[in-house]
């Protein structure tokens, strides 16, 4: 019982730090911070089952976009979104709104990262500042945009595929679209 209480308290503290920590820049500086690494490990554990896209579907994630790429910068992969999580105006580090998969030559999908998404209007109605996760500020994607949705804040986290441009960078040069 004591161990469970300590684990829950540690998780709660880590999540609080994830949401309130000061902002870091892109790249390795953020990746080397012990607290950030501990949080990223928690995200990996929380999303490990979603390496099987059928498990992700059963959990409410549905394909939203085909493979998204940006010539010269890399790709994000195929996005699977959980509509309930996108609509709730809450950012929970252990419950990402989107999962990103890279299509493989054999037709399989490989989980490469997660994305946190909240619509700007919903967030701004409740908060005076844009969201910060893992000590990193989110990006505002204005409308109109290539996705055809209202303005939203987003933050990518490459927890399953190393990104030499930084773990929070939108584009990963190692991810490819067919």
Question: Model-flagged regions — what are they?
Answer:
Residues 1-9:
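Bacterial N-terminal signal peptides that target proteins for export
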């Amino acid at each position: 019982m004591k161990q469970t209480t300590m684990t829950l308290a540690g998780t709660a503290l880590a999540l609080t730090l994830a949401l309130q920590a000061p902002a870091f820049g892109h790249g390795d500086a953020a990746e080397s911070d012990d607290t950030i690494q501990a949080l990223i490990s928690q995200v990996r554990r929380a999303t490990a089952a979603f390496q099987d896209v059928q498990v992700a579907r059963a959990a409410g994630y549905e394909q939203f976009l085909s493979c998204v790429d940006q010539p010269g910068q890399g790709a994000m992969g195929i996005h699977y979104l959980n509509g309930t999580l996108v609509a709730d105006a809450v950012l929970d580090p252990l419950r990402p709104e989107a999962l990103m998969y890279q299509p493989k030559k054999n037709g399989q999908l490989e989980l490469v990262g997660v994305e946190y998404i909240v619509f700007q209007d919903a967030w701004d109605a409740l908060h005076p500042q844009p969201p910060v996760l893992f000590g990193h500020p989110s990006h505002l994607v204005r409308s109109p945009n290539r996705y055809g949705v209202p303005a939203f804040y987003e933050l990518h986290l490459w927890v399953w595929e190393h990104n030499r441009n930084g773990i929070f960078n939108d584009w990963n040069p190692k991810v490819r679209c067919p």
